[in-house]
């Protein structure tokens, strides 16, 4: 979006979901998940719903990528459909989640008891990037600052909550655990 005045809309864009590639490899099922989430929904946590709806970016959404790792070994005592979810939040600065080419270490251990979600937080990995090109394309420095503000922790948590609601929609218990570094 180029320079312009803030707008007010009645509702943020809806969260959209698409399951991507499913790969079975070495006793694991790896599922790619793609989401479109409102660019401004994190503002609800920090500044309130009115701020999210009146932002100049309120009508925009961004892509969020998450990869699910499921241990499919039949020797595990808890069936896949009963395993709780755990989402991994990569610390910073600005890196995507670990790759799953060779699963080992903490991911392998957690996958014995959980469905592990590796979240590429907004601006990182395979999610919509936060790059110099994207930032300068939105307008003058004031508008750029407003845009970058939408990639803070409150927005990452709003994204994680939207993902949780989609992935756990059919479950009675909609809780999940988080882990990060």
Please report, for each region that a protein language model flagged, where it lies by residue.
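Short, flexible, mixed-charge acidic loops at enzyme active sites
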Residues: 129-140
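Donor nucleotide-activated moiety binding/catalytic core segment of transferases
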Residues: 35, 151, 160
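Catalytic-loop region of hydrolases
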Residues: 1-123, 133-134, 176
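Conserved acidic catalytic loop of the alpha/beta-hydrolase fold
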Residues: 146, 154-174
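Short beta-strand immediately N-terminal to the catalytic nucleophile in serine-hydrolase-like folds
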Residues: 178-180
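Periplasmic/extracellular electron-transfer cofactor-ligation site
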Residues: 126
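Short glycine/proline- and acidic residue-enriched helix-loop micro-motifs
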Residues: 141-150
């Amino acid at each position: 979006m180029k320079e312009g005045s803030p707008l007010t809309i009645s509702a943020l864009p809806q969260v959209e979901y698409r399951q991507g590639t499913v790969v079975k490899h070495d006793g694991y099922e790896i599922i790619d998940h793609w989401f479109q989430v409102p660019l401004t929904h994190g503002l609800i946590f920090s500044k309130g719903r009115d701020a999210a709806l009146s932002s100049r970016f309120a009508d925009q959404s961004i892509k969020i990528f998450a990869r699910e790792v499921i241990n499919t070994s039949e020797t595990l005592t808890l069936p896949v459909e009963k395993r709780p979810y755990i989402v991994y939040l990569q610390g910073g600065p600005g890196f995507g989640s670990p790759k799953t080419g060779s699963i080992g270490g903490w991911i392998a251990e957690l996958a014995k008891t959980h469905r592990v979600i590796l979240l590429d937080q907004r601006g990182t990995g395979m999610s919509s990037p936060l790059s110099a090109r994207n930032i300068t394309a939105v307008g003058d420095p004031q508008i750029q600052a407003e845009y970058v503000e939408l990639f803070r922790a409150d927005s990452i948590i709003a994204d994680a909550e939207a993902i949780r609601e989609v992935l756990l929609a059919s479950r009675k218990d909609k809780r999940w655990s988080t882990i990060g570094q």
